[in-house]
């Protein structure tokens, strides 16, 4: 029986989940601009909610695009 090794969270304890932290938020969206699901991100439900809120807030303030127009 083989066990898969648990991946570490991409969010470090020192990272702040904030709408102004575009480098961190861009790790959790696809090239098309969609928010990646929690199972792909390998983060907790609480972190996923905070990431989703921050991405939506950054989109509203035009820090992140709603869609990628380069298709």
UniProtKB/Swiss-Prot annotation:
<keyword id="KW-0699">rRNA-binding</keyword>
<dbReference type="InterPro" id="IPR018275">
    <property type="entry name" value="Ribosomal_bS18_CS"/>
</dbReference>
<keyword id="KW-0687">Ribonucleoprotein</keyword>
<keyword id="KW-0934">Plastid</keyword>
<dbReference type="GO" id="GO:0006412">
    <property type="term" value="P:translation"/>
</dbReference>
<comment type="similarity">
    <text>Belongs to the bacterial ribosomal protein bS18 family.</text>
</comment>
<dbReference type="InterPro" id="IPR036870">
    <property type="entry name" value="Ribosomal_bS18_sf"/>
</dbReference>
<comment type="subunit">
    <text>Part of the 30S ribosomal subunit.</text>
</comment>
<dbReference type="GO" id="GO:0003735">
    <property type="term" value="F:structural constituent of ribosome"/>
</dbReference>
<dbReference type="GO" id="GO:0070181">
    <property type="term" value="F:small ribosomal subunit rRNA binding"/>
</dbReference>
<keyword id="KW-0694">RNA-binding</keyword>
<protein>
    <recommendedName>
        <fullName>Small ribosomal subunit protein bS18c</fullName>
    </recommendedName>
</protein>
<dbReference type="Pfam" id="PF01084">
    <property type="entry name" value="Ribosomal_S18"/>
</dbReference>
<dbReference type="GO" id="GO:0005763">
    <property type="term" value="C:mitochondrial small ribosomal subunit"/>
</dbReference>
<keyword id="KW-0150">Chloroplast</keyword>
<dbReference type="InterPro" id="IPR001648">
    <property type="entry name" value="Ribosomal_bS18"/>
</dbReference>
<dbReference type="GO" id="GO:0009507">
    <property type="term" value="C:chloroplast"/>
</dbReference>
<keyword id="KW-0689">Ribosomal protein</keyword>
């Amino acid at each position: 029986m083989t066990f898969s090794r648990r991946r570490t969270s991409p969010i470090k304890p020192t990272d702040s989940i904030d709408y102004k932290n575009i480098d961190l938020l861009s790790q959790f969206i696809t090239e098309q601009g969609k928010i990646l699901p929690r199972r792909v991100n390998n983060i907790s439900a609480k972190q996923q909610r905070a990431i989703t809120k921050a991405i939506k807030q950054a989109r509203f303030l035009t820090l992140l695009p709603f869609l990628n127009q380069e298709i």
